[in-house]
C-alpha cells in the first residue's frame, strides 16, 4: 500500500508523483512560467521553492541535492547561475500562481505558475501608534495656520501662540485617538 502524501494525489503511485513533480519543476525553471492544472501547481510550489532555496545556498552539497531531483544538468546550471542571483534578496515566495480559467474538454481549473524574478521592494515598517497619531496630528496642525491668517495679531503674540498650539493639538489628537480606540473596543 502506498504511503499517503500531503495534499491531493496526482494519480499513479508515489514514484510517478515524484517524477511528475520533478518534470514540472524542470519545465518551470527552464521556461520561467508554465501553464498547468491548479492541483499540480499547488503541489509543485513547495518543491520549486525548496529547490530555489538550495540554489540560493549555492554550495556543492546543495547542487547535488537538486541534481537528485532534477536530472537535467543544464536546467540545474541555469537555476544556480541565473535564477538564484535574481531571488537572492527575497526570503521565500519565489513562485506566483495566477488563475486562468477552466480547460476546454474536462473543465479542469487551469493556472499559470511562474517564478517571481522582480527585485524585492522593502516595505516601510512603522508602529501602529505612530501611524494613528500622525494623520490626527497633521490635520489640526494644518488648520492652525489658517486660523492665524484670518485674525491679524502682532508678530510677538503670534510666535507665542504657535509655541503653545502644537503641544495642545498633539495632546488633543492623542486624546481623540485614545477615545476612538476605547469606543471601538466597547463595540
From Swiss-Prot:
Coiled-coil residue spans: none
Any single Gene Ontology cellular-component annotation: cytosolic large ribosomal subunit
SUPFAM superfamilies associated with the record: Prokaryotic ribosomal protein L17
BP-aspect Gene Ontology terms: translation
Stored InterPro entries: Ribosomal_bL17, Ribosomal_bL17_CS, Ribosomal_bL17_sf
Keywords recorded for this protein, A-Z: Ribonucleoprotein, Ribosomal protein
Acidic residues bias locations: 145-157, 165-180
GO molecular function per UniProt: structural constituent of ribosome
Keyword Ribonucleoprotein attributed: yes
Chain residue ranges for the region called Disordered: 122-187
Statement: the UniProt record of this protein carries the keyword Cell membrane: no
One Pfam family cited in the UniProt record for this chain: Ribosomal_L17
Family: Belongs to the bacterial ribosomal protein bL17 family.
Quaternary structure (record): Part of the 50S ribosomal subunit. Contacts protein L32.
Protein name: Large ribosomal subunit protein bL17
Species whose genome carries this gene: Clavibacter michiganensis subsp. michiganensis (strain NCPPB 382)
Gene behind this protein: rplQ
